[in-house]
């Protein structure tokens, strides 16, 4: 089964538009036959896990002591397979290396770091290039600003797509 790593904010809550969109994305991913892998905690991570679980999908949570112990967090209730790392950087590398594709849902600096790290690893050949889509207007603005700047060197073009709906996510992962 192919695994899609999903990045996103821990801040969104049930009822928030981004949380509900994430539930739909998780459901669509599971219905398309993908396992989902997230950072294992709350917000987008929980919403993706919930949607995938409700659709009968396999949910992998990759947690880290560095976050869990600092903020006294437990993994979300939808995880079927739990992977634990001590350091955040090891968690991210695992999530990048084990994935067959990536989705970045709305998020902040942590999600931006995950996008940048994954994008750069694909560009330099540190991991195999896989489909990678960023969801929503925030990432569309950020990605287009980077792509239009003189600071982005060669090799970045065409690696990321922008999705505006859960259906777009599936379409962009299968092209």
Locate predicted features.
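Active-site/ligand-binding-proximal alpha/beta "capping" segment
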Residues: 89-126, 133
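A charged, well-structured terminal subsegment
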Residues: 94-97, 101, 153-175
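Short glycine-rich anion-binding loops that position phosphate/pyrophosphate groups of nucleotides
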Residues: 9-12, 65-67, 107-110
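Glycine-rich beta-alpha loop segments
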Residues: 1-60
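Acidic/glycine-enriched connector segments
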Residues: 43-104
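Glycine-rich, charge-decorated loop segments at or immediately adjacent to ligand/cofactor-binding or catalytic sites
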Residues: 42-47, 139-149
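Short, acidic/small-residue loops that bind anionic groups at enzyme active sites
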Residues: 63-65, 105, 119-143, 155-158
